[in-house]
C-alpha cells in the first residue's frame, strides 16, 4: 500500500571524540529529531493559502519542497531549503533521482542547534530516511549517509560525514572521506559505555561549526600528527575490544582541541572537575561548545554531571547536563 506520509527519527551524536577530527562519530540517545515527509496535495508551493505561507517557504517558486519547523528549538532554524539541512538533503535526492511531485517536510527540532550535538545532521538523517521510505527508493545506508551529508552544508558550509553517519548507522562510526566514494565503518560500542554532556548556557552564532573551523591551524608538526594518530588508533581499538578504559586513553587531542578550547569559557575547569569526579575522559563534543565526559557504568554519572555544572558555574554560566549512552541509528516511526 502506498504511503502518503512517513515519519522518521534520528538520534543526536557527538563527533571527533578527541583525535578523530572529521573521522569519528558516535550516536547517542540524548535527543531525537523527528521528520515527517508528506506528499503535497498541491503541485506548486505558491498555491498554498495564507496560513500555510506563515509556516512554509521555498527557494524557487517551482521547487517542490516546503518546510515546516516545530519542536522546542525550531525558531532559529531557517525555512529556506538552501539553508535547512533536511531540505538540502531531500533536494539532492530529488535532483539525482529526477523525482516529480511536491512534498511537505515537517521537522520536529528537539536537538539544540549549534551546541555540538549533531543537530543539523539528525534532521538530515531523519529526512532522507523518511523520504526514501515514502518513495520506496531502496537507497542503501551508505548512500543515505552521502545524501544526508549534503544537508551539512547548511550549518557547516561544506560536506561532513561524521555526525550524519552516526545518526543513520548508529553506534560508533569511522569515516573514510577521501576515496572517490566515501566509506563508513560501523562498530558496535561497549555496552558499559556511558556519557555525560554538559551544554553551557551560551548564545551561539549562526553557522557556528563553520566559524569553529576557522580557528584551526593550517599547518601542524609531524610529531603532533603522530601523537594524534596513535590516540585515534587507540580509540578505534577500544571500540573493537569493547574496552571503555582504552577508548578513554585515546581521547586526547593536541591539534584541534587546543585551538578551540578558548571558545568555551571555563573549559579547563570543567574538564578537571569531571575527571576528579570519576570521568575516564573529557573532550569537546564536535565543534562545541558542549563538552562530553565518558565513563564505564552508571554509578558516577550524577557526580560527573554535577561536577561539570560546578565547573561552568565558576564562569557564572548555567549548564544543562544530559546522561546518556550510545544509540541505534535513524528509524521509521510511522507510515500513513
Locations of regions flagged by a protein language model:
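Gly/Ser-rich oxyanion-binding loop with an adjacent helix/lid
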Residues: 95-182
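ATP-binding N-lobe of GHMP and related small-molecule kinases
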Residues: 1-115, 133-139, 169-170, 326-329, ...
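Solvent-exposed alpha-helices and their adjacent loops that cap or buttress functional pockets
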Residues: 1-2, 16, 26-29, 97, ...
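Glycine-rich, charge-dense phosphate/pyrophosphate-binding loop(s)
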Residues: 239-336
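Short beta-strand segments
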Residues: 9-11, 27, 167-169, 176, ...
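Glycine-rich beta-alpha junction loops
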Residues: 12, 30, 41, 199-204, ...
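Short beta-strand-to-turn element immediately C-terminal to the catalytic PLP-Schiff-base lysine
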Residues: 38, 166-178, 293-296, 333-335
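Acyltransferase
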Residues: 190-272, 276-277
